[in-house]
Amino acid sequence: MLAVEPTMDGDFPPHELPPPGGGIQLQNRLLHCPWWGSFSPSLYPTFSSENQQFVGSTPFLGGQSCPETSYPTTATVPSFFSKSSDFPQDPSCLEDLSNASVFSSSVDSLSDIPDTPDFLQADSLNEVPTIWDVSTTSTTHDKLFIPSGPFSAPEDPVTSLSSTPLLISYQSHSQPEEEEGEEEEETEELGHAETYADYVPSKSKIGKQHPDRVVETSTLSSVPPPDITYTLALPTSDNSTLSALQLEAITYACQQHEVLLPSGQRAGFLIGDGAGVGKGRTVAGIIVENYLRGRKKALWFSASNDLKYDAERDLRDIEAPGIAVHALSKIKYGDNTTSEGVLFATYSALIGESQAGGQHRTRLRQILQWCGEGFDGVIVFDECHKAKNASSTKMGKAVLDLQSKLPQARVVYASATGASEPRNMIYMSRLGIWGEGTPFRTFEEFLHAIEKRGVGAMEIVAMDMKVSGMYIARQLSFSGVTFRIEEIPLSPAFQQVYNRAARLWAEALSVFQQAADWIGLESRKSLWGQFWSAHQRFFKYLCIAAKVHRLVELAQQELSRDKCVVIGLQSTGEARTREVLDENEGRLDCFVSAAEGVFLSLIQKHFPSTRRRRDRGGGKRKRRPRGRGPKASRLSLEAAGVIRISDGSSTESDAGLDSDFNSSPESLVDDDVVIVDAPTHPTDDRGSLYPLQRDLQGPGVVERVERLKQGLLAKVRALGRELPVNTLDQLIHQLGGPECVAEMTGRKGRVVSRPDGTVVFESRAEQGLSIDHVNLREKQRFMSGEKLVAIISEASSSGVSLQADRRVQNQRRRVHMTLELPWSADRAIQQFGRTHRSNQVSAPEYVFLISELAGERRFASIVAKRLESLGALTHGDRRATESRDLSKYNFENKYGARALSRVLATIMGQTDNRVPLPQGYPGGDTAFFRDMKQGLLSVGIGSRESRSGCLDVEKDCSITKFLNRILGLEVHKQNALFQYFSDTFDHLIEIDKKEGRYDMGILDLAPGINEIHEESQQVFLAPGHPQDGQVVFYKQISVDRGMKWEEALTRSLELKGPYDGFYLSYKVRGSKMSCLLAEQNRGEYFTVYKPNIGRQSQLETLDSLCRKFHRVTVEEAREPWESSYALSLEHCSHTTWNQRCRLTQEGKCCAQGLRLRHHYMLCGALLRVWGRIAAVMADVSSSSYLQIVRLKTKDKKKQVGIKIPEGCVHRVLQELQLMDAEVKRRSTHGLAARPPTPRAITLPCGPGEVLDLTYSPPAEAFPTPPRFAFPSLPPPDPSSLMLGARDPATNPVELAHQSCDINFREVLEDMLRSLRAGPTETPAPLVGVGGGGTERQSVIHFSPPFPNS
């Protein structure tokens, strides 16, 4: 590897190949503790994994290997915490919402409701990605690079462990035998036992059942939707063109559109249904419903122009009454002749501009003119995640601008990933979550509050959204779907090519930097943006190319089994093919290497130079003609006035370049880029990339820079002879050519091989068909069976249906193969929705092809676990369900950021990480640190920015950027670095789990246990913004976790393993032997069941089992089992074993080993009390973290709420009583006031129009008081302030979105009257603080609705 010049600190040694052998044996320094020998399983649990050696997986003690333990999937939230100042959430981060609900939340929003459908058992899944878990507070340990000095990361792991008292330390040291197994029992109460519930509309009773099985997440299924008050105008159809769940979504959307937000805009609705449920028909139904009510115009925005035909199909399928669909791309800028119908456009069309002047300079202005003033029709933002990053892109701003300029429009957001990441919600301004009259003035405030609240906060938000009637999210069950992972080893020859490429890129970095220094280039942001963009694409192409041969073999095998194949790609590599064509005057003699093209294009177009190289298309660019013209590469578009619309895109030149594996530079440029006028530059020979400056280094500099450039080009061309050719062309060629393969991508032409062996370039266009229709024709050929292989790219396949549809001729089972997996499970599921949709004959098979590069297997595990949780089955060996914890596979959270920070600081600064290095690295520790430091510098990570012209490396190195960059390391180096990062990540999580600070999201309370009962319930009123009166339920839950003898016997009869069965302990304690039932899982690991605690969370090894227990018959086990089961109902383990317990003798409660566990939780308006409860808990336990749990009682009632540790119960109850008294005091004050005089209603309310979507609390929750109202208050008296007084009264219009039983008609009528008639007479004053004048409080009641409402 050629030496890379560092960006700082002088020279460093050139690359040396690692010496052979030299594997080292590492010892875990965490293990040198006197207490480790007895408690190593509970102190340092490990992850069970087939491909990773995680931290501590093989601990050493005195040179002897300790028994390996497995990672427990359950975790405890103990009532005692370590006194530490480093917590994932500080108390202040929760105060900004202490008295403000994010949404209007009904009284029973989070309380229990009967659960009629049965749960589908699934496995550990965090339903919502934990991207929001990243703390927005800039702390020392979260910084990317610590240049010098000791690394101030989170507290020292050893200190953390030793300073945190073990659970055993809370018991008397005179009872050592009592404490055995204590910690494993304590971890029983929480776990990830994810379930999905079969979805059936609960309050909508119209329509027939959906043709396929649909499920809803267990969290959302725990809360009810609002009552239906809207009556559809859609005619009933005997053909059942709309299913019951589609009609339900239409009803709730139209019902929400009747609500006005405090800003005066009409409320919007979010359809979060997954792929295949039928969002298209639902949207079409909303448009038809409004058409029948006289609103004849609608806007429909989507990701691709091709989806216009799908929109027409959806309208036709539901028998729409002749509604025309007009494509905006086919309408001239000055043409507004279309009077009604649906105007269909892409998001990129919103920023289109006309070069010819005329009446309409922009598409946005043309759309506004077409809609007309006072437009109240439907605006559909389909696949609305394409509009993300709205604050930083011109397209996103246009989406927001359109909504603000049409305030009365009925907005519908449709996206399967819409509410999964709060950052993606910035364009959803009509949900009323932030803005005027809400707790959050801006979206940034909302985002900051949610991100700081931890993993479960967004799930609570989604639940409140559902309760409020603004959100619905269902997804197709993956029942019947199968998948498998194909691991493809890298051949030695390919590894050599890969390593050569990595070294050449390191040299290129040095050469680029040297050339920039020589010419005195000051601004380098765009230069390095282009460099790292090309770097990412180059190695992505190499990763894909390694899998092509195996994919062709698998595809041919599946075709021979009478199946058909769908291959998913992210990009096409067409840009390089067109460049070679231009260089060779339209002739080709071989397939083109996309990887080589990326490298050459970077050097030719962006190498630092004082001359402007006038490339094709340079200068002032014209708008692309309506027919799709030649595709411009991403590199050539950067500096020429191009707006890039892609995941992670930004107006900054280098933003978003290191997004994900699923970024598709060429195809995104083709489909999502609009070329506008480039900024005008002086006609200097230097490009816009470089500042106008004099040649400061003399005339010889230009020649020297040119020599550097030509030398680098020669080396790239030499390497290019060994690089793989274009993946897409190679696949089509090896699978039979264009005659056998249906290509649905965005490219215009392809390279094909003729029978005589020659290679030619041909257009994909066909006679009589425009290029826009080629993909549709190819889809028809695949669905009819004319072609049995389809290749789709992400950019062009959005919304395309390729399932084994009952209505098409080709009903062979689909085998969906993917060469690239995105690093987000949500995005992967979205892609798989192309072949798994409603009304299919057979479910598809998925094949993930992965290599051994940079942890690809770990990312495949993320997607596999998500598929399993949705009901899919793997062909391979299923892991034990209790070991599935998806959270450990997600790096995009605060633990990933901290792990990255720690790894970089350790490698660059040699600080102590306390995490063992990867075993067996050639050369040992010294070689590892030397190679990793040099490698990080060679990929631009870890360097610092200076004015002397060194590398401009982003300060905020994200996880995705890190994972992309390390692909540029040699194979053995990137795998070792990824392993080290992964081990550090796991270690940080384990530390926080030990100290009770790990945020595991929403967990299930006592998963797998049916004996859960609600013992008692107390009701408290909570203060809130802008009205009081929301209800919080305090519940005491009892869990009987014991296992009856009959249940144990039934389970034992099903066991077949040689070591399965009942066991008795060798040790006799209190004249009794311990009894258990062991069930072998995989290898030597056993799941253990005990009569008092049921299933034990930790797995036991065969060695530990046989050391303490011996096998017995069923007859021998019965008496000890039944005795232990009966005694443990009221007696702790200490009493059972020793006939006494020190804690009970002291008058305290001991729950050790008891069957019956008591838990305390809060349900109801959680967001209103979150801040105050967190503050109380912080005082008691030094942690403000609130664990959100869900459960299902034995009588099938589901509950979601905050679990209160037993030690905090007393203080929490005191706080609830204070809040309740405060609210009741205000209510009493309001009852004593004279209610306002009823006035005539002047605001019309047509049939079916509902302005009040609120609930009344259950009668038992709060006794029905007489009718009362808050009166208007006089101007404030500075000398007299009422105790507990709140801020000045809010304008009534700001109350319109709250569900506190507000009489909206009266509020709106009062507003209109005040606007028309001016100030009115002030009612009799009352002592207090308020706005006075013309303002008056809204009527609030806890009884049935008012007669006039």
UniProtKB/Swiss-Prot annotation:
InterPro entries recorded: P-loop_NTPase, SBNO_Helicase_C_dom, SNO, SNO_AAA
Protein's job:
Acts as a transcriptional coregulator, that can have both coactivator and corepressor functions. Inhibits the DCSTAMP-repressive activity of TAL1, hence enhancing the access of the transcription factor MITF to the DC-STAMP promoter in osteoclast. Plays a role in bone homeostasis; required as a positive regulator in TNFSF11//RANKL-mediated osteoclast fusion via a DCSTAMP-dependent pathway. May also be required in the regulation of osteoblast differentiation. Involved in the transcriptional corepression of NF-kappaB in macrophages. Plays a role as a regulator in the pro-inflammatory cascade.
User: Where does this protein have compositionally biased stretches of type Acidic residues?
Assistant: 177-188
Q: Which family does it belong to?
A: Belongs to the SBNO family.
Q: Where is this region: Disordered?
A: 170-212, 609-633, 1319-1349
A single GO BP annotation from the record?
bone mineralization
- Where is this chain compositionally biased, Basic residues type? 609-631
Quaternary structure, from the entry: Interacts with TAL1; this interaction inhibits TAL1 occupancy of the DCSTAMP promoter, leading to the activation of the DCSTAMP promoter by the transcription factor MITF.
**Record organism:** Mus musculus
Q: Which Pfam families match?
A: AAA_34, Helicase_C_4, SBNO
Q: What induces it?
A: Up-regulated by interleukin IL6 together with soluble interleukin receptor IL6R in astrocytes. Up-regulated by interleukins such as IL1B or tumor necrosis factor TNF in astrocytes (at protein level). Up-regulated also by other cytokines such as interleukin IL11, oncostatin M (OSM) and leukemia inhibitory factor (LIF). Up-regulated by lipopolysaccharide (LPS). Up-regulated by interleukin IL10 in a STAT3-dependent manner in bone marrow derived macrophages. Up-regulated by TNFSF11//RANKL in a c-Fos/FOS-dependent manner.
Organs and tissues of expression: Expressed in the spleen and bone marrow, and to a lesser extent in the kidney, liver, brain, skin, heart and muscle. Expressed predominantly in osteoclasts, and to a lesser extent in T-cells, B-cells and osteoblasts. Expressed in macrophages.
Recorded phenotype for the gene knockout or disruption? Mice display a severe osteopetrotic phenotype characterized with an increased bone mass. Show a reduction in the osteoclast surface/bone surface and eroded surface/bone surface ratio, but the osteoclast number/bone surface ratio is normal. Show also a reduction in nuclei/osteoclast ratio. Exhibit an impairment in TNFSF11//RANKL-mediated osteoclast fusion. Show a slight inhibition of osteoblast differentiation.
State what protein this is by name: Protein strawberry notch homolog 2
Q: Which Gene3D superfamilies match?
A: P-loop containing nucleotide triphosphate hydrolases
Recite the UniProt keywords alphabetically: Activator, Differentiation, Osteogenesis, Repressor, Transcription, Transcription regulation
